[in-house]
């Protein structure tokens, strides 16, 4: 019984492969122009990347490294002072 079922499945798979559309059929709704899609994706990704690099290098966006940080770990007051902890 397994041999018959396996042969029927192989036959059905083979028949569907014989009836498949030509991959170069440009009238098919499942035909995609992969080259144009790739070029369009590179343009859509490269434009914001180049724009970001231009903005960073233009000097309009200045990072202020000379300022002192607002919070230094050495200046923080201690959270637990002697006598403030209670035994419950």
Curated annotation (Swiss-Prot):
Q: What is its main location?
A: membrane
The alphabetized UniProt keywords are: Cell membrane, Glutathionylation, Ion transport, Membrane, Potassium, Potassium transport, Signal, Sodium, Sodium transport, Sodium/potassium transport, Transmembrane, Transmembrane helix, Transport
TM region positions:
39-59
Q: Does the keyword Transport apply?
A: yes
**UniProt-annotated stretches for the region Disordered:** 66-88
Pfam family, any one: ATP1G1_PLM_MAT8
Side of membrane Extracellular, spans: 18-38
Hey, what's the signal peptide range on this chain? 1-17
Tell me, which GO biological process terms does this entry list? positive regulation of sodium ion export across plasma membrane; potassium ion transport; sodium ion transport
What is the membrane topology noted in the UniProt record heading this document?
Answer: Single-pass type I membrane protein
- Gene3D superfamilies in the cross-refs: Single helix bin (1.20.5.780)
Q: Where in the cell is it found?
A: Cell membrane
Stretches of the chain found on the membrane's Cytoplasmic side: 60-88
Superkingdom of this protein's organism: Eukaryota
How would you describe the post-translational modification of this protein?
Glutathionylated.
Q: Per the record, GO CC terms?
A: plasma membrane
Listed GO MF terms: sodium channel regulator activity
Q: How does it assemble?
A: Regulatory subunit of the sodium/potassium-transporting ATPase which is composed of a catalytic alpha subunit, a non-catalytic beta subunit and an additional regulatory subunit. Interacts with catalytic alpha subunit ATP1A1. Also interacts with non-catalytic beta subunit ATP1B1. Interacts with the alpha1-beta1, alpha2-beta1 and alpha3-beta1 NKA isozymes.
Q: What task does this protein carry out?
A: Associates with and regulates the activity of the sodium/potassium-transporting ATPase (NKA) which transports Na(+) out of the cell and K(+) into the cell. Reduces glutathionylation of the NKA beta-1 subunit ATP1B1, thus reversing glutathionylation-mediated inhibition of ATP1B1. Induces a hyperpolarization-activated chloride current when expressed in Xenopus oocytes.
* Protein family according to the UniProt entry: Belongs to the FXYD family.
Name of this protein: FXYD domain-containing ion transport regulator 3
């Amino acid at each position: 019984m397994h041999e018959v079922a396996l042969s029927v499945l192989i036959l059905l798979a083979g028949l569907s492969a014989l009836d498949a559309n030509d991959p170069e059929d440009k009238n098919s709704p499942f035909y995609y122009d992969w080259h144009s899609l790739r070029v369009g994706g590179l343009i859509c990704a490269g434009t914001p990347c180049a724009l970001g690099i231009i903005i960073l290098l233009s000097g309009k966006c200045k990072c202020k490294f000379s300022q002192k940080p607002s919070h230094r770990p050495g200046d923080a007051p201690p959270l637990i002072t002697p006598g403030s902890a209670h035994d419950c």
